[in-house]
């Protein structure tokens, strides 16, 4: 799993990685096996506003998926278990009565050669 920002584990709010099967790199997260226990990483952005995007490639299935948001995010969480991985891009909303705001999320699913 790749992110468009530097990942700094020392800035995470919470880390749950009981089997140590999730490995954190500078801009990517890799797995050294299939986690049988739940894992969770809170606040991958370290509280800094970043471009909201991620890309996940399954090498065995030769398929990729990515998400890009039209907003800035200051919080990205990552949760997973067994064959599930769930990146969460948070969008902080503050609007007054009568105001409106718009944002979008685009997902792309593709084959990998």
Label every PLM stretch briefly.
Residues 24-113:
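Beta-strand-rich recognition/accessory modules
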Residues 11-15, 19-24, 32:
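Conserved functional micro-motifs across diverse proteins
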């Amino acid at each position: 799993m790749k992110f468009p920002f530097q990942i700094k584990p020392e800035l995470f709010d919470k880390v749950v990685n009981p089997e140590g099967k999730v490995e954190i790199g500078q801009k990517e997260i890799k797995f050294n096996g299939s986690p049988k226990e739940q894992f969770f990483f809170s606040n991958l952005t370290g509280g800094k506003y970043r471009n909201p995007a991620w890309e996940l490639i399954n090498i065995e299935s030769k398929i990729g998926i990515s998400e890009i948001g039209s907003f800035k995010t200051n919080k990205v969480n990552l949760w997973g278990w067994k064959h599930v991985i769930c990146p969460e891009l948070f969008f902080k909303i503050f609007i007054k009565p009568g105001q409106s705001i718009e944002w979008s999320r685009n997902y792309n699913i593709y084959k990998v050669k």
